Amino acid sequence: MIYTGIEYIFVNISFVMFFFVTLLNLINLFYKIDKIDHFSKNSMTIAFFCTTGFLITRYLQTRHLPLGNLYESLMFLSWGFSLLYLILEVRDQIGLSHAVLAPGAMLIHAFATLSLPQQMRSPTLLVPALQSQWLMMHVSAMLISYITLLCGSLLAITLLSLFYGKVGSVTLEHKFEKQSFFFLMNPRKNLWKQTGAENYSYFLISNSRKCQLINCLDKWACQTISLGFSLLTIGILSGAVWANEAWGSYWSWDPKETWALVTWLVYAIYLHTKVDKRKMGEGPAMTASMGFFLVWICFLGVNLLGVGLHNYGWLA
């Protein structure tokens, strides 16, 4: 009973903090206020430790890794989003990750706490198939890969919203700015005379900032997806070994296995298109955006069917 009360406190505080951070970042999109970054970082730190406290409390209750049902997995996802937020807080100087990760953590947390029935949120014993030493390696690798892939895809979606319809393929450091520069300097347009020196300078500065945003988004999306792809590969391989031990077959074309393979192939295509690091365009960003929906299909969608070997304890 005492564990239930502690969990309730941790869950509610973390949800309030996620909501507060999301609100602060939305305000910061329109009104750049220095103190907002400080408050949002501290609030996300509180949310991170509260979610960590929930996971530890659930472990003390069940004596197994808190990844045994949908509720625990979703809470682990929100924990991972908050951790990535704090990591990128240090490394991302532009702050693009804040507006992406904070709403993601809040929505996942809200779905887990407000949408799932009480029965699904209650601690449960592991089904026999999950009572294995492979649980930590396979399930944690898959969930962490989902966290990083979702984060990278959200960054790609943000990039696409800035980039779509502007140019088809640009060289990051030069081409985007050069095109705008020559467009402005085209004597047939007489833009210098029409807009004046002040507007001309403002346009160049604005375009330079947009190019910097696109560069940063592309960099973080590629690096995050690369990490997630590696973890997804480890998760699939460890799952195949575990499946052979539990069910006598490395691969059975279970719905979740099939969609995991489809997701892996889509992100493999994305990384293949990013071999030339100087290039970016709509194609890679759209591929990563497609991966965002595939991850959710793989994580939640196939369980709505109520069939398959991975259906235990979820949405059936």
Curated annotation (Swiss-Prot):
InterPro entries per record: Cyt_c_assembly, Cyt_c_biogenesis_CcsA, Cyt_c_biogenesis_CcsA/CcmC
Membrane topology according to the record: Multi-pass membrane protein
Subcellular localization(s) per the UniProt record: Plastid, Chloroplast thylakoid membrane
Protein origin, superkingdom: Eukaryota
Residue stretches spanning the membrane: 9-29, 39-61, 70-90, 94-114, 143-163, 224-244, 257-271, 289-309
GO BP annotations listed: cytochrome complex assembly
Keyword line: Chloroplast, Cytochrome c-type biogenesis, Membrane, Plastid, Thylakoid, Transmembrane, Transmembrane helix
GO cellular component: chloroplast thylakoid membrane; plasma membrane
A Pfam family that the UniProt record links to this protein: Cytochrom_C_asm
One GO molecular-function entry: heme binding
HAMAP family cross-referenced by the UniProt entry: CytC_CcsA
UniProt similarity note: Belongs to the CcmF/CycK/Ccl1/NrfE/CcsA family.
Protein task: Required during biogenesis of c-type cytochromes (cytochrome c6 and cytochrome f) at the step of heme attachment.
Assembly with partners or alone: May interact with Ccs1.
PANTHER family with a match to the protein in the record: CYTOCHROME B_B6 PROTEIN-RELATED, HEME EXPORTER PROTEIN C
Protein name as catalogued: Cytochrome c biogenesis protein CcsA
